[in-house]
Amino acid sequence: MKNKLKKGSKGFTIAEFVVTIALMGTMMSVVLPSFDSITLNMQASQNKTNMDMIRQVFFGYFYDTHMKGVAHLPPSPTNEESLMDEEWANEIISADMIPTTPNELFSAGEIPTNANGHPFAYETWTDTTFLGSDGMKVDYYVRITDVDEDSPSFEVSFTSAI
């Protein structure tokens, strides 16, 4: 027996199906680029947050060592791009203090990276200003930069002083 649809039966015709697919395709072409933009903005924001967190933790370390009489920041990495890579992150910061590595300063046990898992560049330096008979003032500077070309925050950096 053949099943024949009755005139009043419910269902889609091919034309209705094609129109529905076309409308969904049009909507997706608008939504997907927006989603990609939102994702990139969120990754850039997370990268900036991670750079700021590193700065705050290193400044906390500086204040702790200052209270112990030997104020210093973790030294700049000596690799070509000054990256906070695993080798640098596992080196002891100062032999004069309790042996601590940069990784151990963070509660997660490792230095935060960018959204792509690439380490940030880090450098530190001092600037000494002589104040005449009042002595001198030493400013400690930190610069943290995202040097990953595939990162949405490429070349964004934070420079701060204590």
Regions found by a protein language model. Give the residues of each.
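N-terminal secretory signal peptides that target proteins for export/translocation
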Residues: M1-K6
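N-terminal single-pass transmembrane signal-anchor helix
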Residues: G8-F35
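Aromatic side chains
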Residues: F12, F35, Y61-F62, F120-Y122
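Membrane-proximal N-terminal amphipathic helix
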Residues: L40-G69
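Extracellular/periplasmic head regions of type IV pilus-like filament subunits
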Residues: Y63-D146
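Low-complexity, S/T/G/P-rich flexible repeat/linker segments used as non-globular hinges
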Residues: Y141-I162
